[in-house]
Amino acid sequence: MNRRVALAALVSIALLGAYVHAQFGNQPAKLDTIKIKDDLFVIHNDFVPGNTTVLVTNEGVVLVDDKFEIDHENIMAQLKKITNQPVKYVINTHYHADHSGGNPKLQGLGAQVITSQQAREKMAEIKQPGMTNVTLDNSLRLFIGGKRIEMYRFGRAHTDGDIVVLFPDHRVLAAGDMFTFGDATPQLIDYAGGGSARDWTGTLDGALKLEFDQVVPGHGLVTTKQEMRKFRDSTLTLRTKVHDMIAGKKTKAEIEKMLRTDFKFADLHIQRSLDGLMLELQ
């Protein structure tokens, strides 16, 4: 990557973060807590920011994603409803601020942050507060309070640093934005962050080989492995349609209309994904 391309990518990453924060991170989200198991919960909200998964142990709490910084106090209030244990670890499924913005305040309370190496590099590029303390390449296991948590990176999808977090004793997967569900948000390929429409399907195939029944999506309500399979199929349909339209000499405007109609792309998705899709799938 030459210096000009690298600079353009860096600016794009920063602009995406600024856009999302300006649109959704300027006031705290209304949160509620959903119980999955006796010791496993989701702090949920509508649309943005992302879901926060909570594992409670007798040695402390593990969070998967921690929303925007402005949501910190509300997250802590939700945690106090279910436990007095401190937060020991925060696992970010990727670098975006609606999943990692709470890192600095939680680190100030003693928590350690875990991400993929790729996510840490993106955080460093944009000088994002709350940098990672521990990174993983392909997998990592965490043992706390007699419970096991497994983290995996299967490849590029929403970004190049996406990881999934498996709670094997509960057969629950926290998928991050590799999988979003319902009307929460359609597939967003963050090309500036290393995302890939071509690789996304195979990355999901890797995650789907894990043993789980329920899924916490990056955005949307807790759902099933079958719904994640359906989402996987939709990623294949999307890239096939775009590729075929490019091969058929369809215009950019025609492809945009198809994405808005068939895949519920909003302005953000068009701005962040359309040019990259056309370049990657030509």
Residue ranges and their predicted role:
Residues 28-31, 35-36, 60-62, 67-70, 117-161, 168-169, ...:
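Metallo-beta-lactamase
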Residues 39, 55, 65, 79, ...:
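Divalent metal-coordination and catalytic microenvironments
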Residues 1-10:
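Bacterial N-terminal signal peptides that target proteins for export
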Residues 33, 57-62, 70-112, 210:
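Active-site metal-binding motif and surrounding structural segment of the metallo-beta-lactamase
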Residues 48-50, 61-63, 68-71, 95-100, ...:
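Solvent-exposed loop/turn segments at secondary-structure junctions
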Residues 32-78, 163-167, 172-177:
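Conserved beta-strand hairpin/beta-sheet module of binuclear metal-dependent hydrolase folds
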Residues 13-24, 208-211, 222-282:
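Accessory terminal helices/loops
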